[in-house]
UniProtKB/Swiss-Prot annotation:
The keyword Ribosomal protein applies. It comes from the Eukaryota. It comes from Ipomoea purpurea. Binds to 23S rRNA. GO terms for biological process: translation. The gene is rpl14. HAMAP family: Ribosomal_uL14 (MF_01367). GO terms for molecular function: large ribosomal subunit rRNA binding; structural constituent of ribosome. Belongs to the universal ribosomal protein uL14 family. This is Large ribosomal subunit protein uL14c.
Length: 122
C-alpha cells in the first residue's frame, strides 16, 4: 500500500534511484496505491549524467509492494521492497531494462512492455 510521502526504489535504468510518491492517479480521494497503479512522484535520488535529474516530477507504475497481494487462487505474494518503473505519458517505460521480479497482474493493466522487459514474472 503506497500513499503520498512513501519512498520507493526504482526498478529500471532510467537514471532515477529513489522516488517519493506525491499523488495517486485515479479517483480524486484515493488513499492507497497497489501493484499496477500509476502514481505521480518526485525523484529523490538520481544517477549522475543521466536524462532524469533530482527533484524532477515523473509518472511511475508500481511493480512491487511490501503489502501482500492476494490472488484469486489463494496464493499470496509479498515482496521485500516497494518499487516502481518510471513511465512516459503513453505508459511506456523510460528505461530499457527492468531489475527484479514483477507481478503477473501488470499484464492485466496493459503494461505489456514492462512485462516483456522483466527478467522474472511471478
Amino acid at each position: 500500500m503506497i500513499q503520498p510521502q512513501t519512498h520507493l526504489n526504482v526498478a529500471d535504468n532510467s537514471g532515477a534511484r529513489e522516488l517519493m510518491c506525491i499523488r495517486i492517479i485515479g479517483a480524486s480521494n484515493r488513499r492507497y496505491a497497489h501493484i499496477g497503479d500509476i502514481i505521480v512522484a518526485v525523484i529523490k535520488e538520481a544517477v549522475p549524467n543521466m536524462p532524469l535529474e533530482r527533484s524532477e516530477v515523473v509518472r511511475a507504475v508500481i511493480v512491487r509492494t511490501c503489502k501482500e497481494l492476494k490472488r484469486d487462487n489463494g496464493m499470496i505474494i509479498r515482496y521485500d521492497d516497494n518499487a516502481a518503473v518510471v513511465i512516459d505519458k503513453e505508459g511506456n517505460p523510460k528505461g530499457t531494462r527492468i531489475f527484479g521480479a514483477i507481478a503477473r497482474e501488470l499484464r492485466q493493466f496493459n503494461f505489456t512492455k514492462i512485462v516483456s522487459l522483466a527478467p522474472e514474472v511471478l
